[in-house]
Every structure is written in C-alpha cells, then in structure tokens.
Amino acid sequence: MDSYIAITLFGCFFVLVFIGVPISFSIGIATVASMLLMFPWDIAAITVSQRLANGLDNFALLAIPFFIFAGTLMNSGGIAIRLINLAQVMVGRVPGSLGHVNVLANMMFGSISGSAVAAAAAVGGTLNPIQTKQGYDPAFSTAVNVSSCITGLLIPPSNVLIVFSLTAGGVSVASLFMAGYLPGILMGLAVMIVCGIIAKRRGYPLSERATFAQACKAFLDALPSLLLVFIVMGGILGGIFTATEASAIAVVYTFILSVLVYREVKWRHLPKLILESVVTTSIVLLLSGFSVGMSWAMTNADIPYMISDALMGISDNPLIILLLINIVLLIVGIFMDMTPAVLIFTPIFLPIAQELGMDPVHFGIMMVANLCIGLLTPPVGSALFVGCSISGVKIQHLIKPLLPFYAALLVALMMITYIPQISLFIPQLLGLM
C-alpha cells in the first residue's frame, strides 16, 4: 500500500509540474490524491487543511516577508552601483578585473538582498555594457555574472536557509547563517579562479588603479549598505534579537538607507515595492504550507524510510550515499526552484544524512549549495534566464562558456560535502554548536 501512495504522490506531482501547473498547487493536489488512498474524502480534506494551517502557524516564518521586503528595497535603492564601485577598488588590478568585480559585487549584493536573480539583474545590468566596451566576450561576461550571482545565497542573511531551518524542525538559524560564510566564499573563489585563468589567456585588460581618495570614497559610499550584515548578524550572535526580529530591523534600516539617505526610492514607489514583496511572500508561504502537508503524507506512508532503504541497498559507504544524494539534488535543481526543492526533499534526505552521522547544519549548507547550481541550469534556471535577458546573449550560446564554471562549482560542492569543517568551523568557533 505504501508503494502505491508513493507512486501516486510523486507521479501526480511530476505530471502536474510537467503540464505547467504552478508548483504550490501541484504539491497540494498530489498531497490530496495520496491522502485519498489513506483516508476517506472528508478526513483527507480536513487533514490537508489542518496541515496547511499548521505549516503557516510559525512565528519564525515572519522573517521571510521582512527579508523579502528588505531585499526589494535594496534592489531599487542604488546599492548595487556602490557595491560595484567598492569591488572595482578591491580587485581592479587583477587580470580580467571586471569579471572579478562582477563576482565580488554579486557576492556582496546577493548576500544583502538574498536574491540571486536580483543580483544577476542589478550587477549584470551595470557591468555587462562596460565589459563589452572593453573587449570582453558578451557570452563570457554573462557566464561570469550568472555563475557568481548564486554565491550570495549562502552568505547571510538568507531566506533559503530560514526555509531549511523550519523544514528541518528548527535547526538553529544563527548556526546556519554562520555556517554559510565559508562555503559561499569558496564558491565565489571557484568562479574567480576560472574567470582569472580565462581572462589571462584572452588578454582582457586591467582596470585603472584607483587613487587613495577614490578608494576611500568607494568604501564610505558602500559602508552603510555593508553595515546591514553586521547589524543583523551582530544582533543575532550577541543575543540582542532573534533572526525574526532581525528581519524587521533589516527592513527599517534598509528603508532609512534607500528612502532617506540614498534617496533612490521615492515615497510614491513604496506601494509598488510593497505589492511586489506581498506577491513573492504569498508564493513562498503557500509553498511552505502545502509542503508541510506533503511531508506529513510522506512520513505517514514511510516514504523517507523506503528511500533510505533503497539508498542503503546500493551501498553502506557514507561517501557513496552522499554522492548519490548530491546527484539526485542536482537533477532536482534542473527542474525545480530552490524553495520547493528544500521544502520537499529535506524531510526525505535529512534523516538519511543524520543516520550517516552528518550534522543537520552541514547537510543544510550542502543542500543549498547544491540547489544553487540548479539556478544556472535550463529549463528552470531563473538566474540563467535573467542573465541572458540582461545581456542579450542566447541561452544556447552560453552553455559552452558556462561549462568551466559548472566544473569549478561542482568541485566546490564536493569540498563542502566531504570537508565538514568548511561549514562547521565558524559556528563551532563561536560556540553555536
């Protein structure tokens, strides 16, 4: 019976996604279909409704709309150009300097805004025309932009890590945030190494050396934006406020910065920005609610144990099992966005990882790093589509230039997977674990 429930649940879900039904409704319909095999219609309907309500009845979920609104304000607040100017001062004399500026700016902007798509649009939209004027191949510039925009998703504050924390049963958000720093930087360095090698071979120019006055101005212009990370993380680590309270403080700080200090966001723009944030939040919360129901159905049908037994039947070597999990997640990332993938597959793979002795924080970072790569991969790679639309490069012309960056990111993923201290060193150093 359990096998029929599993086939119904996943079969219905993937068929609905394939024919274009929104993922949140695909999850909900598949959950109802599987529960009808377990309960009568009236009990199944009540159970789904209860699980949907329970999935949203969590105070920590308030962090998501606040961080989303903060990110929306940042996207329109003139922060990207200030971070780009700072990055140019920092790496302007490295071969292929504008490529490295792109990577560094994406890391900073992505971590502050929490959105790879926003980072790709803001940074790529500013730098791609400049790179083209200086002789950079547009496909190469786009490949650098697309592959680096994902690195900021691991560097806190990160909405995806909050979603993982809630799905994993309350794994410490502070531990996840601090664990994301080194893996995020590692993925950024991997992209920069490939960028530097290709740029040196092609003879791409260096930027002009910044004077001390220019460097000071760039730093001071970007400092208010960078302070947001220190305020949020310092407050969480210092026990001054929780991650949820930090998200509200991030909104207040970003509002002051964008509206009153930089004055890039006008009062008349606020209703539109609020509406954008509400729409995005609605999508995430609906996914979260339905995914709780799906997770309950999977657990009730012993699906995680069935998958665990299947994996353990292939090999009892933890290294092989983790490799298989990574392969499955890479395939999932090709067809599914990060948030639904985290919501659906965390309840399946986290128990297996814990059975192997893997820390939940380490697993969360590995999972998010893995799914980040899916943002670069068609047919659902949102960062890929945005990067191409910004630069005007066709996707088919971008696949070959992206391959070296894919390889570098996969090497970084394997290091994150098999070297736990890359993720756990900072949380352990700070006494969070």
Language-model features: where?
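Alpha-helical transmembrane segments of multi-pass membrane transport proteins
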Residues: 1-433
